[in-house]
């Protein structure tokens, strides 16, 4: 019992909806308390299937078809593809956890355009604000790249500012690395020392923002899904949390009160 992360997509070929639901039902029956839907491009799910079901259709089918499932998350999603139905599920469905990971990549519009992203900086900020307004306990994560080709100091600063502007609680920071044969590899490159420095600066801003957010959770009541070690797990907003008491059975969901911080997690 515990948390399972399984990919329901393979090589950008979507697994049929009925098969995903059957997988979810079987895993739930085996004792898994939480499932995570993840894939190469999660929000484009269903485009290559008969009837072109949307990700929101898949989530609804899982929740209806696996009534014993207690918690569901989705992996990284594209801001441009969060439609009204998916937004409603993320913000109103009790079994959907209050945590979403957005594929943002950068906070500068020119860099986003050169990355061929489908959203602008304003789109990202607006979506983050909508999510937080509709579900104030939502924790937003994001992928951010430091040192993409042609990024200057001003563009890097706009990406750092995005951490606060988009209420980012969990940031995955990636220093840019050129891949031969890609359009980006043919653009003017940022030097390796500058890339490393910008990645470090992003991590510092993200770390400070996360610590401030974690501190705000002290004294709050949360639900913890106990994982395999019996003494830790994740609460609904995905904050890593350790029990300060005796071990509990893996897979059990416990009501807890947050007592303090434990490094980059809670206790």
Regions found by a protein language model. Give the residues of each.
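Conserved SAM/AdoMet-binding glycine-rich loop
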Residues: 29-153
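C-terminal, non-catalytic macromolecule-binding modules
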Residues: 134, 153-154, 158-202
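Canonical Radical SAM [4Fe-4S] cluster-binding loop centered on the CxxxCxxC motif
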Residues: 1-18
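Terminal RNA-binding accessory module
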Residues: 178, 185-267
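Radical SAM enzyme [4Fe-4S]-AdoMet core and its adjacent flexible, acidic
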Residues: 46-64, 68, 115, 178-208
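Conserved, mostly hydrophobic/aromatic
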Residues: 20, 37, 74, 102, ...
